[in-house]
Amino acid sequence: MHWTPEHAQPLNQWPEQHLDVSSTTPSPAHKLELPPGGRQRCHYAWAHDDISALTASNLLKRYAEKYSGVLDSPYERPALGGYSDASFLNGAKGDPEPWPGPEPPYPLASLHEGLPGTKSGGGGGSGALGGSPVLAGNLPEPLYAGNACGGPSAAPEYAAGYGGGYLAPGYCAQTGAALPPPPPAALLQPPPPPGYGPSAPLYNYPAGGYAAQPGYGALPPPPGPPPAPYLTPGLPAPTPLPAPAPPTAYGFPTAAPGAESGLSLKRKAADEGPEGRYRKYAYEPAKAPVADGASYPAADNGECRGNGFRAKPPGAAEEASGKYGGGVPLKVLGSPVYGPQLEPFEKFPERAPAPRGGFAVPSGETPKGVDPGALELVTSKMVDCGPPVQWADVAGQGALKAALEEELVWPLLRPPAYPGSLRPPRTVLLFGPRGAGKALLGRCLATQLGATLLRLRGATLAAPGAAEGARLLQAAFAAARCRPPSVLLISELEALLPARDDGAAAGGALQVPLLACLDGGCGAGADGVLVVGTTSRPAALDEATRRRFSLRFYVALPDSPARGQILQRALAQQGCALSERELAALVQGTQGFSGGELGQLCQQAAAGAGLPGLQRPLSYKDLEAALAKVGPRASAKELDSFVEWDKMYGSGH
C-alpha cells in the first residue's frame, strides 16, 4: 500500500499491513515488539498530521531496518500455539511477552522532540527535518557496535533517493538452515508520496549540516532491482548484484576416455547371449566362391574349369562352398570360440587326400586307349565355362533342391560319412517336361560341388554314327576322370538308350558303350565323377538303364510364384516393368508353361515391339499379343504320365 496522508490508517494496524507488504514467508513470530507508549504517540502524531509524509516514510524505513535485524538474528522458535487469541484480532497487539532480538528494544522518543517545525514549512525544509532520524544521502556512518561478523571498515556513500535496498546491520551468512531466507530488502521500503523525486529541490539538503548518527554501520552493496510492480515511476533502478553461480548439476557420471559405460557393457552382454552362441550353427545364404579357387579340390592345371572355377591343388582340406561354408572360415564370421566340452556332438572329419570312395580323387594319368583327337574335341567343345549357378537362380522347386542337397551333395562332399562298403551315389536321373529346368539343376550341382562340367547331348552323339558316337562318349568319360571332380551332364538320354523293342539301330549301337562307360566311369575305380542324365521320356528307358541311375527325381513345371519370378527376371532384361495387377494377370494366363516357354514368350513380345535398338518399351499389350503365338507344349496326359512314373520308379522327395 502507499503510505500517504490520504490513505492514513490507525497505527495499531501498521504491523499487519507492514507484514503484508514486505514479505509472505516469515511467520508471525518474526514481528517486532513495539512499546505500547511509542505506538500510541505515533498514532496520535500521524492522526493529527503533526509530521510530514516524508518524515513518516523515513520513520517507517528506519523501523524496517530494525525489523530486518531481528529477522536475521538467531532465535529460538517458540512452540506452536504459543500466542494468545488477542494476537489474531484487529487492534493492539496482545502477545504475552516481547520477542527477543539481537539488541534491546529501540527506545522511541517523542516525535516532536528535535522537530522545530511541522510539515507546513514547505520552503524551509532544512529546518523542519533537522532532527529526522533518517539517513541522509552521502553521509558516512560508523559500524554497529555489536556486529559479530566484522563489517567493512568504512561505510559506502549512499546515493540520493530511495531506489536502493537495505540490509540488516548485523547481517552474517548462515552456514546451516537455521532460518528461512529473509524477504527481499527492497520490499520493506515503501514508495514515497506522489510528486516526490530524487532531483526535487525541496529535499536537496547539503550533507555537511548533519551529524553522524550513532549506532549505524556501513551497509553492503544493495541487492538486485526489485520486480516491476514495486518500483515507483521516476526512481532510478539500483545497481544489480552479479548473478549467482548456477547450482551444481548431479547428472550421470561421464565415462573416462577408453572406458566402457554400463549401458555398453549391457549391450555387449546381450550380444553374447544365447542368440549369439547359436549363431555358429545358423543357416547362411549361398555365397559366391572365393577368388583363389573353389572350395573343392580339383586337378592342378591352368585349363578352363566348368562354371568359372579355377583349379586347386589336390588334397587341400577346405570348407564346402555356398551355404556349406562359402569358402570363408568360420572364425572369420565372428562366432565365439567353443571348447570340446560345449559341443557334445562330433564334427564331420576333414576329407582325407585320397580316401576310398572319395569324390575328389585325381588320377593324374593320361587316358589310355582314347583317341587323342576326340579327347581334344571334348576338351575344347564340351567343357562348360559359363557362370556359376546357385540354388537361388533356380525358381521354385524347393522340395527337389532340398532332396538333392541331402541325398547327393552332402554325401559327395563328406565321403567319410559313408564308411565301409557304403558309397555316395554317382549317378542321378532328372526327368520331366521339356524346359522345366533339368539342365539348369545339373549346372547348379556342378557349382555346389566345385566340379568341372562337361555337357553332352544324346542327339549330337547319335548323329555322326554309332562308331563316332561311341568314340566321343569314351573320350568324354576319360576327360572327366582326368579332371576330378567332374560332373558329366548327358541331356536327351532317351536318344542314346531307347527301349529294346523300338528297333532303333543308332540307339542300340550306342547303348552298349554307354552302359559300359556308366559301369566303368562310375564304378569303384572311377572316383570323382558324377553323371547326371536328363530325359523328357522316362518311359522309353529300359530296366537296365534305370538300374544304372541310383537316384531318380521328377522336375515338375514351375508353380505360380516361380512363374512370377521367371517373368520378372526375363522382363527386367528387356527393360519392362509391369504393375502388380498386370503381373498377376500374366502369371494366371501362363498356367502350364515351363521355364523355357516363359522365356520364349518374353522374346516374342520383344520381337513384336520393334527392331532391336529401335523398339519401344514392352507393355502388357505386347505380352498379351505374344500369348496368342506361344503356348504350353506339355499336355495334361504327359504330365500325368510323369507323375505315375515317379510313383513307380522315382526316389521321391
From Swiss-Prot:
Annotated ATP binding sites: A395, G435, A436, G437, K438, A439, L440
E.C. no: 3.6.4.-
Record localization: Cytoplasm, Cell cortex
Catalytic activity, as annotated: ATP + H2O = ADP + phosphate + H(+)
Location of the region described as Disordered in the Swiss-Prot/TrEMBL record: 1-36, 86-129, 216-240
Record's compositionally biased regions (Gly residues): 119-129
Reported cofactor(s): Mg(2+)
The keyword Nucleotide-binding is assigned to this record: yes
InterPro entries registered for this protein in UniProt: AAA+_ATPase, ATPase_AAA_core, Fidgetin_ATPase, MT-severing_AAA_ATPase, P-loop_NTPase
GO CC annotations on file: cell cortex; cell leading edge
BP-aspect Gene Ontology terms: microtubule severing; morphogenesis of a branching structure; negative regulation of axon regeneration; negative regulation of cell migration; negative regulation of wound healing, spreading of epidermal cells
Stretches with biased composition (Pro residues): 97-107, 219-240
Similarity comment text for this entry: Belongs to the AAA ATPase family.
Function of the protein: Microtubule-severing enzyme that negatively regulates cell migration and wound healing. In migrating cells, targets dynamic microtubules (MTs) at the leading edge and severs them, thereby suppressing motility. Microtubule severing releases ARHGEF2 which activates RHOA, which in turn regulates focal ahesion turnover via focal adhesion kinase, as opposed to F-actin polymerization, to suppress cell motility. Negative regulator of axon regeneration that suppresses axonal growth by selectively severing dynamic MTs in the distal axon shaft and growth cone.
Entry protein name: Fidgetin-like protein 2
Organism: Homo sapiens
Record gene name: FIGNL2
